Amino acid sequence: MTLMQKSLAQCVAVALSLSAVSAFAATNLTGAGGTFPAPVYNKWAADYNTATGAQINYQGIGSSGGVKQIIAKTVDFGASDAPMKDEDLQKNGLFQFPTVIGGVVLAVNIPGIKSGELTLDGKTVGDIYLGNVKKWNDPAITKLNPGVKLPDSNINVVRRADGSGTSFVFTSYLAKVNSDWNSKIGKGNTVNWPVGLGGKGNDGVAAFVQRLPGSIGYVEYAYAKQNGLAYTKLLDADGKAVSPSEQSFSYAAKGANWSESFAQDLTYQKGDNAWPISSTTFILVQKEQANAEKGAAVLKFFDWAYKNGGKTTNSLDYASLPDSVVEQIRAAWKTNVKDSSGKALY
């Protein structure tokens, strides 16, 4: 090889190296928001890193925190279980799209009671969180559980202390099934809880329930399973006792009108074996991306997750979105997420 050829080869190698470094840096992304989807987002990120080398750092700080950070443009994407209203999206220049479907369950710590051995209905759950049902052997509970030996002990209520999309989903359900809750408390990421110990994040609530006998708390299903917590059955909209599962979360989404809006409320939906506290969870991105490479990289990551993350999604007890909805999302990316010149990033 001549000196000129060696020099040319070295220049090409350096150029390729610099190009690779630039591409790698462009795909290092940060996201923050709900703890509800954190298990699946973090596993997707690990698998994506293995497949592509790209680094995706997701922090489960709560949905309210995720919304604040994407509005402040301190993260590349935010995450929230509570969909933002259209006027708030427009005001802040944001676009939202769903990723997976999950379920909120009632985790309990009652000596001798295993998962699925206790059944509750919406009115009773609401009355527990209103502080009206105070004992585990209250008639409201025992009539739903004939033959189940329940202790004459206080119910220790656990709820979220932080702004939470999981709380939004849970209180949306309670507002539908308990008229007193609807009129006195309502729904939201944060509400004026009448009773209860506050835990930060799904993991904080799970930790309280795990160590506090007689407790009940609401958590995303994966957190109950990962922490070995017992969870209840719930009566669905048809009055049938249903267990939480990836399938029952999917059933809750069957009646959703996705073509009308991505922001579908899946709580207390009619349908055979539909879990009453099911929900989609959402990603928030800036509609106009100042950094086009990062904006495109966010969409590339979630596109990869839709194509390749289904097995992971289901293994962590979330349900995948219907294929038709994913295609609607991809079409929406083309018209809603652009660079500063107006060029589509997908």
Predicted regions and their residues:
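Bacterial N-terminal signal peptides that target proteins for export
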Residues: M1-C11
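Flexible loop/hinge segments at secondary-structure junctions
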Residues: A25-Y346
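Bacterial N-terminal signal peptides
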Residues: C11-S22
